[in-house]
């Protein structure tokens, strides 16, 4: 039997992993959509190769680690570390379109979750965003939302990677 806490985590996980949840995840597909928009011929194996490379070289060592740290810092209410993490990941996204897509998706996710969850850290993050004091990076916002929803780091990691793969 699953505990009530496990069921709550799984329900929250499904809720923000739903493709109808309005976060604009497609904007974070790291250019995969442009392959299809430009009618480029690409095989299934090539798509798998692109996704594997991005998971190993970008998403895993940067965005995933940032998300896990943001979740951890939110759980211990270390807002200064959340802010620092947000600034660092933003500075690592050298391509303007990727950086802007991360911000748009991150803030949209935070705003949506904030509508149905009462969380002090998430509210503070959104206030700091309005004041221009943080960027709203998607990986940071995701970690804060996972914490606000009571989702474990392991389940949040699976959700985060799943979101990248299907976007």
Short names for language-model regions:
Residues 12-79:
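Glycine/small-residue-rich interface belts in oligomeric ring/scaffold proteins
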Residues 2-13:
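Charged, compositionally biased N-terminal leader segments and the immediate start
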Residues 13-22, 51-57, 91-98, 126-132, ...:
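A short glycine/serine-rich beta->alpha loop
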Residues 26-30, 139-140, 167:
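A generic alpha-helix surface/boundary motif
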Residues 35-45, 116-124, 148-156:
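Inter-helical turn/loop segments and adjacent helix faces that build the functional surface
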Residues 40, 160-167:
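C-terminal auxiliary extensions adjacent to catalytic cores
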Residues 64, 76-149:
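Internal, conserved structured core segments that host functional sites
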């Amino acid at each position: 039997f699953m505990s009530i806490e496990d069921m709550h985590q799984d329900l929250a996980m499904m809720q923000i992993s739903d493709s109808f949840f309005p976060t604009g995840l497609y904007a974070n597909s790291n250019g995969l959509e442009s392959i299809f928009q430009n009618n480029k011929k690409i095989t299934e194996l090539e798509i798998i190769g692109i996704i594997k490379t991005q998971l190993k070289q970008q998403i895993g060592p940067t965005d995933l680690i940032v998300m896990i740290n943001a979740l951890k810092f939110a759980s211990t209410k270390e807002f200064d570390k959340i802010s620092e993490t947000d600034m660092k990941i933003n500075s690592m996204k050298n391509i303007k379109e990727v950086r802007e897509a991360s911000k748009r998706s991150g803030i949209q996710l935070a705003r949506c979750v904030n509508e149905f969850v009462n969380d002090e850290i998430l509210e503070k993050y959104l206030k700091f965003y309005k004041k221009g004091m943080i960027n709203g990076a998607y990986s940071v916002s995701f970690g804060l939302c996972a914490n606000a929803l009571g989702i474990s780091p392991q389940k949040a990691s699976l959700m985060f990677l799943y979101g990248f793969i299907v976007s």
